[in-house]
Amino acid sequence: MTARARLRRLHDAVARGTAAAIHRLPVLEAPFLAAGRRAGMVASVRVFCGRAASELARRWQEDAASHRILRVAGQSIRLDVAEFYAHDHFFFGQPFEPGLAAFLATWLRPGDTFVDAGANHGYFSLLAARLVGPSGRVIAFEPHGGARERLQRHLELNDLRDRVAVHPFALSDQSGVATMHQSHHNALASLVPDQSPVRHLVSFGNTFEVPTIRFDAWRAQHAAGPIRLMKIDVEGAELMVLRGMPDALRSGLEAVVLETAPDSDADRLLRDAGYTVRTLDTYEDGPENRLYTPRSLTM
């Protein structure tokens, strides 16, 4: 065994021991979190803390004790800190999609309309609801029943139910019924799991049926009017959503944020439709949050 391998084994053993101690003595949780969130932590210490945090989260999850109510950008959200999207925020204070959150804060105004396609547990719907105020509208689409229930609970927790309309549809290129693929990760599901940007992190297994609707059809039925911003994050089905809203893309949308890769089919569709693009957030080995605005709009 090499010296590096021996050191790695030692680090793993100490990390497991640290997690076991915190698991037995909850009073140690606060100082551990403070250490993990300290700015300027050297890389080796962060790696050690990361291993200990993962082991601790696993133990909490086995005890059905891994859910925490977190304060994120002024919103109260109950999340499972063992799941990847909440893990680093809880243990290391890393923000959720900071570029997109910062853009919302500068772009949305009181009275605006925000559409959240793939709202999940509702972080961006909550943030937008605060920004558009009681005179604005937030329209959230979330077909996954469990995620939609969490979204509704978060609206109640933050006293924002009157500002957010929640719909059970999956936006798509046709209206009807489609098969959604459930991941072992409770908050994620996709119409096209082989195109999901997190397919290398999670596996998709069980399926269930969901109602689908073209956004143009929904918009015509509800006389939606001008939309200041639409966020589309639908686990690989972004192109299907865009193909169901050509009228909205021609008029009625001031900006679109898409989770997609540069030069993807969805990216090319928007650029061919006359939208300019800039990146808000980038992720290692993953898609980007990309902002699209009509060329006629000066930002």
Range-by-range predicted roles:
Residues T2-M299:
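Phosphate/nucleotide-binding beta-alpha loop and adjacent structural elements of enzyme active sites
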